[in-house]
């Protein structure tokens, strides 16, 4: 089974608005519609069997509706595994975890840059402690600011791994979007998963080769960042930039199966 481990889908009422926010922040054009139906159509064309849809609440007030949508996706789209969201300002985060568990949601997405908190916020620690038993975390890492100024960075992620060695976590964007040289220093080779989303257009070739040499291929999962990228385009870009063989690309596409389903 081939898995796209990094996608975003939105309710039709807000899909265009959500895409506009993505486009404004990253100064790019979202190629796809951003709906579950469009995601699954494009994934199928690319030979992808299953997708992980990530939800991230931009404020504490958005945690409940965000997780309600994750539960809806989980229970209405058999080819989608949904990840819910937490926020350090949310006082009822334990209840939210219970709701996610009851609906079969076993993943949490954190995006400090969009959610307006820092990844080194100690209020996250009780959440990691409680959820590490039965949840996978996918955490956005990196942006254009220097690591010490950016809400997320590879060094903050490394500190979390030190504090929670049993945490099952995916460091998005090969460990640090636009901070790949720091990801090479702080995360590559560690006991952490990385996804390949939103990397192939920007990552310098020498840094990409160094990360792939240092980080085991069996700890990489494929991701498109849909609706920003089309799945087939991203598969092609992955193979072109990495120069992996068909079998090696298939291995990365299949790694998400082991992570999701054992």
Regions found by a protein language model. Give the residues of each.
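Hydrophobic faces of well-ordered beta-strands that scaffold small-molecule active sites
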Residues: 3-7, 51-53, 81-84, 108-110, ...
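Conserved, mostly hydrophobic/aromatic
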Residues: 6, 43, 70, 100, ...
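Divalent metal-binding pocket/active-site signature
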Residues: 33, 57-61, 88-91, 103-184
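N-terminal/domain-start segments enriched in small and hydrophobic, helix-friendly residues
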Residues: 40, 44-55, 124-146, 188-191, ...
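Acidic (Asp/Glu)-rich catalytic clusters
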Residues: 40-46, 67-79, 96-104, 125-133, ...
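Active-site-adjacent C-terminal substructures of enzyme catalytic domains
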Residues: 163-168, 175-234, 240-247
């Amino acid at each position: 089974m081939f898995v796209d481990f990094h996608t975003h889908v939105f309710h039709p009422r807000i899909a265009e608005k959500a895409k506009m926010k993505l486009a404004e922040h990253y100064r790019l054009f979202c190629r796809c519609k951003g709906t579950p139906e469009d995601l699954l159509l494009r994934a199928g064309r690319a030979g992808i069997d299953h997708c992980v849809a990530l939800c991230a609440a931009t404020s504490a007030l958005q945690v409940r509706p965000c997780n309600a949508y994750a539960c809806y996706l989980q229970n209405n789209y058999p080819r989608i595994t949904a990840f819910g969201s937490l926020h350090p300002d949310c006082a009822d985060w334990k209840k939210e975890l219970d709701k996610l568990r009851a609906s079969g949601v076993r993943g949490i997405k954190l995006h400090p840059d969009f959610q307006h908190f820092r990844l080194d916020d100690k209020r996250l620690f009780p959440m990691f402690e409680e959820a590490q038993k039965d949840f996978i975390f996918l955490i956005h890492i990196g942006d254009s600011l220097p690591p010490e100024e950016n809400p997320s960075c590879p060094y903050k992620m490394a500190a979390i791994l030190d504090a929670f060695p049993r945490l099952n976590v995916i460091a998005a964007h090969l460990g640090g979007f636009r901070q790949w040289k720091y990801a090479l220093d702080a995360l590559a080779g560690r006991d952490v998963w990385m996804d390949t989303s939103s990397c192939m257009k920007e990552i310098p070739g020498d840094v990409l080769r160094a990360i792939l040499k240092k980080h085991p291929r069996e700890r990489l999962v494929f991701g498109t960042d849909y609706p920003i990228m089309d799945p087939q385009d991203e598969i092609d870009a992955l193979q072109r930039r990495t120069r992996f063989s068909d079998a090696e690309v298939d291995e990365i596409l299949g790694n998400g199966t082991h992570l999701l389903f054992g």
